[in-house]
Amino acid sequence: MVEYYDVLGVQRNASPEDIKKAYRKLALKWHPDKNPDNKDEAERRFKEVAEAYEVLSDSKKRDIYDKYGKEGLTGGGGGSHFDNPYEFGFTFRSPDDVFRDFFGGRDPFSFDLFADDPFDDFFGRRGHRANRSRPGGSFLSTFGGFPAFGPTFSPFDSGFSSSFGSFGGHGGFSSFSSSSFGGSGMGNFRSVSTSTKVVNGRRVTTKRIVENGQERIEVEEDGQLKSLTINGKEQLLRLDNK
């Protein structure tokens, strides 16, 4: 039987912070899209990691699991437990839903550089990561050579810095949306992310598209295209604006 603490590689007295860090690391490692050549095992591991996190990150579920094991949550234990709110069975969520919720609704495969770091809220280190960076390529470079943003960009590093900088301050974040899809091969992967911020009274929309190994970033201000970057190279624009 699967032992959730072993799945996450943590001790039984692990703190909530330890459990979050373990899930983050393993979910990224075993995400099926990152393991196209080992998809069956990746899907199994990804599901196990999601189940373990869903139980151990919730104090009530974790307490029941510690007392009765997985059967205490699924209703398969011996008899009824008067203090078990999941007496009639707890239903696990989709591992994709757990993954999406953990990353704040943002798809890491269409990570938006211009939005706030999604891990600030989880690890409480906002304002303490100013110039930290790590050498090495982008996480996206593991997807068959997708272009990286630069030698220090790693979207899943809790302390990454980007050469793109930021729009400055908290400019009134309006919205964020993303989507991605792809098969087991690397020739049909596509991800799209769009974010909108209000900066100094101007509506700034950033769209990032990764498709078939090519990355395209478009930045618009009040509906007008202001910059276009393809595979890390800024393109010259012919703007007919008055």
Swiss-Prot record:
It is found in: Cytoplasm, Perinuclear region; Nucleus. Keywords: Chaperone, Cytoplasm, Nucleus. It holds the Pfam family DnaJ. Residues 3-69 form the J domain. GO terms for cellular component: nucleus; perinuclear region of cytoplasm. InterPro entries: DnaJ_domain, DnaJ_domain_CS, DNJB2/6-like, J_dom_sf. One of its GO terms (molecular function) is unfolded protein binding. It comes from the Eukaryota. PROSITE patterns: DNAJ_1, DNAJ_2. CDD domains: DnaJ. One of its GO terms (biological process) is chaperone-mediated protein folding. Has a stimulatory effect on the ATPase activity of HSP70 in a dose-dependent and time-dependent manner and hence acts as a co-chaperone of HSP70. Plays an indispensable role in the organization of KRT8/KRT18 filaments. Acts as an endogenous molecular chaperone for neuronal proteins including huntingtin. Suppresses aggregation and toxicity of polyglutamine-containing, aggregation-prone proteins. Also reduces cellular toxicity and caspase-3 activity. Homooligomer. This is DnaJ homolog subfamily B member 6. It comes from Xenopus tropicalis. The gene is dnajb6.
